[in-house]
Amino acid sequence: MIDSATFFKRKHCILLAVAVLAGCSTTAPRTVSEAPTPVTLPAATYAKAAWSALPPVSDSDLQAGFVAWRSSCTRLKNDAVWAKPCATAAAVSDKDPAAIRQFLQRDLDVYALRAGGHQADGLITGYYEPIYAGSLTRTDKATVPVYGTPDDLVVVQLESLYPELKGKRLRGRVEGKVLKPYDDAGTIAAKGANAPVLAWLTDPMDLQLLQIQGSGRVRLADGKQVRLAYAEQNGHPYRAIGRWLVDQGQLKKEDVTMDAIRAWARANPARVPELLRSNPSYVFFVRNPDSPEGPRGSLNVPLTAGYSVAVDRSVVPLGSLLWLSTTRPDGTPVVRPVAAQDTGGAIAGEVRADLYWGSGDAAGKLAGDMKQKGNIWMLWPKGVPLPN
């Protein structure tokens, strides 16, 4: 009898062979690659709950969360799960909290998310759209390249042959007739990539944090800004640089924030390359037109500050409406509906979300300090089977 780990590895091997023979042509997805996770979740991951079990929200948060979620319908209008609720929601006034509540309670059921089938508390973090100084050409100060998708990067969608592996992808490059792992971040930093350079930054830490956030802007010398969004990833697992600092005895676990990591980097410039090599994952970007809207997440709709979240799509399908209960770093309650519109390499697990806080330094401070406990409920269309 084959155990699940061996079976999963064999599937990878079979698919690699098929992919190479087929030429490995595919369209680059927007989702962030994650290390393999179990594809079958316990049924108790989704625990049916009553509407009365949800913590109350203000009318303003209800309206803002509804509007953020409804923007997902531009991508979901033909989706088997969400087409009907989206069609109904189009006629609901976002100025009428009572009408929004009526729609939600009539069309959607409530399911509490449970880690391991029983644990209600999970981790809620934050992210934002950073703005960094840079240039469109290399200069004496701007020497750190931001790469677009490499020409030789191959992406294999596992679900094309194995539906139960939905959302899982392999990435690499073809050498001869063999698909090999793509270069890790350290190799790319040392040797470069076979990819266009979209912009140049002044600090390698800026690039690392840009990759962690998944999108950002480059502020040019003339004041104009270039918007960058996640395009692809090199296929290597994400390793938190904060964890490396803890393992090295440089920071205490409870002290790890973006500000603390940057302060360490400024105090230890000679060790910054070592720090960056500890995370083999490398994100490639695409230039997007500048816009007052938020950056586009994995669902390819603009993110809404405070009301869009990144999730583990193997648990929560993109486009889902969630009810979030957590706190800000200062303890202020955050209770609101949020839209699952993005993914992230570090976002894995049943009760796990990354809340988008907006653009710039203030949003960055809030996002960087946020490591809160929280509870999540999924609002799922009535009569529709739960995700597998």
Q: Regions from the language model: what does each represent?
A:
Residues S25-A28, A47, S58-S60, A64, ...:
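C-terminal soluble interaction/assembly domains
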Residues T45-P289:
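Secretory/export targeting leaders with adjacent low-complexity proregions
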Residues C13-L16, Y46-A49, A120, R277, ...:
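Short, functionally important structural connectors and interaction interfaces within domains
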Residues A28-V39:
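Short, low-complexity, disordered segments immediately C-terminal to signal peptides
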Residues V20-G23:
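C-terminal motif of bacterial Sec signal peptides marking the signal peptidase cleavage site
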Residues I2-I14:
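Bacterial N-terminal signal peptides that target proteins for export
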Residues A17-V18, D79:
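Residue-level signal for mature regions of secreted extracellular proteins and peptides
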